[in-house]
Amino acid sequence: GGASLAAKSAGADVTHVDAIRQVIDWTRENMELSGLTGIRWVVEDALKFLRREVKRGNKYSGVVLDPPTWGLGPKNEKWKLEQSLIEIVELVSKVVEPGGFVVMNTYSGLPPSTLETLWRRVLPDASTECGELCLQASDGHLLSTGSLIRVEL
């Protein structure tokens, strides 16, 4: 929820989507503690939300994605990022307006080059920048925790 709060504090109109109500409640509480208002909260699977937004023709100037590596749906449906990543990229590419941006981080072991390949396949003319997310160990070594990509349309 930190990205949603940062975007709102910078003046953006924000829609925060998460399938887990507790995450929405926690982020809403942080919004209130920060003195912010006006975030649109949607408790729903992000893929279902994106499919509907594409059908409605809704567009966004930016999309920030922080998908889980895996999860269980309300009926114990198993979800793995690797199985849905292509659809996520395709749907997001349809809801971001020209001149918009996408920021996506993953923690599934996908290297940055794989993220870049997927986004470039769907948006070949977009500008991309990708890298590794790391934590610095006490001995100074960097420990990889995930990947990040920024896409500008």
Enumerate the language-model features and the residues they cover.
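Hydrophobic/aromatic beta-strand patches that form the interior of the parallel beta-sheet core
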Residues: T15-V17, V42, V103
